[in-house]
Amino acid sequence: MEKLSALRSWQGRTESIEDLITSAPMRALSATLDRNDADPTHGTELPPLWHWLYFLPHHAQSEIGVDGHAKRGGFLPPVPLPRRMWAGGRLHWHAPLKVGDAVKRTSTILSVTHKTGRTGDLLFVVVKHDIHNASGLCVSEEHDIVY
């Protein structure tokens, strides 16, 4: 893949997003999953993985690519392959996230790696997300994205 060196230059790129842990997304997911959870109040801890309810992208329709994701070349590198999939990941919980927490997620592109598979070129991008509240690091997560 001739553009690999240019794509590797995206390693180390970061972006930060701030959010507020509110109860509405928790109530909505509880209802969707038909759970009988008590209404979350200030200080209620998020169950594991429910941090995915926050830091949602807000792209204008004109900024969305044909694959339904944000057009390439924003935070993620402009990989010239047709499909993007989540290939795996790792999660570490350091401290609970709670309703009322002001939080910040800092995302970093850790690596961009080319491989050749049965169907041709593959590009793997590993993105690390660190989520902090006022007390410090709460969640560390890595996403393996394959193109």
Task: List each language-model region with its residue ranges.
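HotDog/MaoC-like acyl-thioester-processing domains
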Residues: 1-14, 86-147
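Hydrophobic, proline/glycine-rich low-complexity stretches
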Residues: 1-102
